[in-house]
């Protein structure tokens, strides 16, 4: 009897590392609910929305707390439901992955995704960190990095890495020629071994392309509109509508609940745009300095 109970609990995980007894479909996630935005562990769903011209055009819920694994299935869901494919996709750094970039490239969709290290790149501490790959010289022809001390880091081997979705990426491992007597060792190498770099060339190449996209005038406009339209929609749902928790239980019922909520949001948005004579407005424009 006890083994039967254990087997039932194990089956309820469905590939996750947690679930709620009151709603087996829900996964424990960090919720920022108090006034200090402190993380509290509670059962919930990862709600994703896609916004176009200030309207929520797609929404879905996921049991994975990490946004990065929701991008590809969400884009597939949008195309299936709407019957067409958007030419570009704008998202924040939480959605960045080599798999996501590859999917967008294969589908001929332009990526406007912030790199995960985008904010760090701007910090002085990051720019002065000699251990970072970004602060080393790279010879593309010879495929060699040169560290702050002038030592060469050459490619030793390539290892394959598979994500939880099954996507396989190649990681090139670089190693320095000797760090034992280097005067900068404490600032660079964190182990007693020689300095190593684990580099995904595929990710770097696609990340650089996306980075150039977000720096363009169009990219700046899209990122601004993502902040206004997507974050604004979540703000209205959570604060203006005071929607703090789902009333129903189970993934199917919760999805119906969020769909109804988004439908109400879109009706209010349409009314607001009609009142403001903004029905032909699609993107907020950048202010001229």
Q: Where do the protein language model's features map onto the residues?
A:
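Anion-binding and metal-coordination hotspots
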Residues: 1-289
